[in-house]
Every structure is written in C-alpha cells, then in structure tokens.
C-alpha cells in the first residue's frame, strides 16, 4: 500500500473567506509546490467569480518580504483568491529591536535645561528636573523624580493611556497623545507628594495624586513599584 503523502497546507473555510494553515517545519520550496498544486493547478473557477479573501497562518516560520510577495502572487494566480493577511508567530530582528525600544524603560539622570529636548521611544524615568523651556518626550509614560517646570509629552504616537508623573508638577505644558493642556487649570502647592497627569473620560488632561493611579490605570505597574 502506497504511503500517503504528507500535507503541508490545511485549508479551512470561514465566513471571511479561506484560512490556510501552513506547515512551519517543511522547506519553503515544498510549501510553495503544494500551494501551487492544490490552489492553482486544480483551480477551475470562472474568471468573473467574486474574489475570496485568504488568510495565511505560517506558525513559527519567518518569511522575508520577498517570500511574502511570492506567496501572494502565487495564490493570486488561482483567479479569484487574494491574500488579505499573513500571520506569523515570529518577527524579524529589526522588528524585535523596534518593539524593545518602544516598550523598555529608559532611565536618564540629568537636568533638561531650556532649549533642550529629551526623546525616548518607550517609558522614560528621569532622575532630575525639567527646567522652564526644556522638553521631555516619550512614546510611553513619563516619570520624573524631580521638578517638571517645562514641557512633557507622553504617548507621542497617539497613546492616550500614557501618564505623566513628577515629584513637583509645575509644567509649562502637558501633552498626552494628541491632547494638550497649554495653561493648566489646576493649582499646585508645596506638598512633598508626587502627582500624575492623565486623560480622563472627558478627553481632558487632569492632574491628581499618584496614589490614584492604581485605580485609574491598574495595568500600569512596572515603574510605580520602583519609586
């Protein structure tokens, strides 16, 4: 009895089209060969048939941009199939570095003086002051163990869940995501208590005691535990 050939492609129909589960242990060439055999050569669909979306799940296989394009082109040859998404469990080195930069906590010990700009991709922990005219910008949260008397912009890429915290909160301007507070409408005093700025349910920046943060942002725990 002839041994049954192992299949590297599993096809499942969904309400959104077709999902192809591609084996991540076989060679790339064997994978392409089976896709061509099952989807292209056996295709008998009329040229005017409606397009069907195809979602590829490639598991732990990394595909280069050129290989992704080759896959899309091969499947498109079956007349009515078009690749809508390619999902992989792995990322490239460049993507990994970018992810780390955006999620890491960057600790800086310095004074940001007038005219200076300190910019980080992830969360910022500043051990020092931000003087009037100085600016700190972060892709994530900003924590200042010192006085904030200049400009602070957290979540600059649009993250409205970001917060700004400082030992002394007397900023010239606060920005979180695309929300800006030019003239803070809150009063500060000389209490030795950290304060934090966040966006409330009315899409406005408000400042309150840092202790309230555990209720406002329960998932924000990485830096608070260190301060």
From Swiss-Prot:
Residue pairs linked by disulfide bridges in the UniProt entry: none
InterPro entries with a match to the protein in the record: CAP/MinC_C, MinC, MinC_C_sf, MinC_N_1, Septum_form_inhib_MinC_C
GO process annotations (BP): cell morphogenesis; division septum assembly; regulation of cell septum assembly
Keywords assigned by UniProt, alphabetized: Cell cycle, Cell division, Septation
SUPFAM superfamilies: Cell-division inhibitor MinC, C-terminal domain
Pfam families given in the database record: MinC_C (PF03775), MinC_N_1 (PF22642)
NCBIfam families documented for this protein: minC (TIGR01222)
Function: Cell division inhibitor that blocks the formation of polar Z ring septums. Rapidly oscillates between the poles of the cell to destabilize FtsZ filaments that have formed before they mature into polar Z rings. Prevents FtsZ polymerization.
Family the UniProt entry places it in: Belongs to the MinC family.
Assembly and interaction partners: Interacts with MinD and FtsZ.
UniProt cross-references to PANTHER family, sorted A to Z: SEPTUM SITE-DETERMINING PROTEIN MINC
Protein name: Probable septum site-determining protein MinC
């Amino acid at each position: 009895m002839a041994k049954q050939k192992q299949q590297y492609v599993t096809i499942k129909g969904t309400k959104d089209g077709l999902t192809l589960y591609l084996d991540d242990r076989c060679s790339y060439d064997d994978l392409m060969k089976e896709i061509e055999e099952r989807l292209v050569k056996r295709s008998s669909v009329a040229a005017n048939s409606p397009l069907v979306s195809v979602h590829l799940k490639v598991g732990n296989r990394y595909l280069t941009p050129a290989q992704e394009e080759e896959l899309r082109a091969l499947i498109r040859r079956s007349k009515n199939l078009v690749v809508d998404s390619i999902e992989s469990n792995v990322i490239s080195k460049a993507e990994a570095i970018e992810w780390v930069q955006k999620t890491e906590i960057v600790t800086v010990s310095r004074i940001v003086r007038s005219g200076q700009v300190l910019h980080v991709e992830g969360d910022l922990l500043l051990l020092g002051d931000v003087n009037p005219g100085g600016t700190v910008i972060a892709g994530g949260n900003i924590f200042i163990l010192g006085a904030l008397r200049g400009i602070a912009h957290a979540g600059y890429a649009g993250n409205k869940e970001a917060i700004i915290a400082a030992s002394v909160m007397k900023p010239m301007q606060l920005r979180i995501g695309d929300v800006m507070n030019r003239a803070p409408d809150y009063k500060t005093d000389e209490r030795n208590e950290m304060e934090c700025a966040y966006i409330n349910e009315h899409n406005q920046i408000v400042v309150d005691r840092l202790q309230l943060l555990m209720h406002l942002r329960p998932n924000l725990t990485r830096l608070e535990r260190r301060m």
